[in-house]
From Swiss-Prot:
Organism: Maricaulis maris (strain MCS10) (Caulobacter maris)
Gene3D superfamilies reported for this sequence: 3.30.465.10, UDP-N-acetylenolpyruvoylglucosamine reductase, C-terminal domain, Uridine Diphospho-n-acetylenolpyruvylglucosamine Reductase, domain 2
Gene Ontology molecular function: FAD binding; UDP-N-acetylmuramate dehydrogenase activity
Protein name: UDP-N-acetylenolpyruvoylglucosamine reductase
Disulfide bonds: none
Length: 315
């Protein structure tokens, strides 16, 4: 029996052997056995409730911080878009956003509604679902600072509403169960002038453009900093990478950026194995020279191929 034959009837769309490299910013990797595009939350709920437990399920957002391995992704890859990308301004300077909404579009929706405090999202690549899962942030602000309610579905299709305290957020991490699929959230801001908000957003964008290789095929920050923001004498991943000769280090078509050496770059010819090898080589150097274990911030999913060494997947 084929995988598709084992899946429930849905209102959304299934695509067999779906190419994924075009759905990620690094532009590498093999196909999904099946790609599922749910019509809405109830459609996704039914899919989860009726899909056999032994079939792997993986969620893919904008693919901004995801490396799909060359062997492709087993089971079903779920991509949240359409109905999951909506935003809505609420009373009390709150904003509701679907998990498939791009972070920068949420920032713009908040600005238009005169809701301040969410402008940092314009500097965070990816979608709200990823921001919720990894407590994404930039420039001394993170998602846990502004989220007040999270909506998710578990692997059985049950709808869950959770508070930030229940998720026990910490630096680039949350304690939500791995099988939860975030479908949306509510954010709390404060009254502010839309023009003033937009000015701050433009400053964040300009800062990123001068310090990060955002025009390249990259996945953003490769490794989380060893210490959270505010730590005295905070150790930063880029400084550690630079200290071991990682700036510009290359394997095949993959290298660490000369502009910001915590950014992996695909020059257009890299394989997923090249990119992962560059990261692992530099991690090994940092471990050997500084006795520090850098933690992947890039989420690596799928099967390895050929002789590529299997590493633990990180979110």
């Amino acid at each position: 029996m084929t995988l598709l034959a084992q899946l429930p009837t849905v209102r959304g769309k299934y695509i067999e052997a779906a190419p994924l490299k075009g759905l990620t910013w690094l532009r590498v990797g093999g196909p999904a056995d099946v790609l599922y595009l749910p019509a809405d939350e109830s459609d996704l709920c039914r899919f989860l409730a009726e899909t056999p437990d032994e079939i792997p399920v993986t969620v893919l957002g904008a693919g901004s911080n995801t490396l799909v391995r060359d062997g492709g992704v087993p089971g079903v890859v779920i991509r949240l878009a359409g109905a999951f990308a909506k935003t809505e301004a609420l009373d009390g300077y709150r904003l509701r956003a679907g998990a498939g909404a791009l972070d920068k579009m949420v920032a713009k929706a908040a600005a238009k509604a005169g809701i301040g405090g969410l402008e940092y999202l314009v500097g965070v690549p990816g979608t709200i679902g990823g921001a919720l899962r990894m407590n994404a942030g930039c420039y001394d602000q993170e998602t846990s600072d502004v989220v007040v309610e999270v909506i998710a579905l578990d692997r059985m299709g049950r709808r869950i509403i959770a508070s930030p305290d229940e998720l026990a957020y910490s630096y680039r991490h949350c304690e939500a169960p791995e099988d939860w699929i975030f479908t949306g959230a509510v954010f709390q801001g404060q009254a502010d002038d839309p023009d003033a908000i937009t000015k701050r957003m433009n400053a964040i964008t300009a800062r990123r453009e001068t310090t990060q290789p955002i025009r390249e095929k990259t996945s953003g920050s490769t490794f989380a900093n060893p210490d959270p923001p505010g730590t005295p004498n905070q150790r930063k991943s880029w400084e550690l990478i630079d200290s071991v000769g990682g700036r510009g280090y290359r394997v095949g078509g993959a290298h660490f950026s000369e502009q910001h050496c915590n950014f992996l770059i695909n020059d257009g010819t890299a394989s997923a194995a090249d990119l992962e090898q560059v990261g692992e080589d530099v991690r090994a150097r940092v471990r050997q020279q500084h006795d520090i274990e850098l933690r992947w911030e890039v989420r690596r999913i799928g099967r390895v191929s050929g002789d590529q060494k299997q590493e633990g997947q990180a979110g």
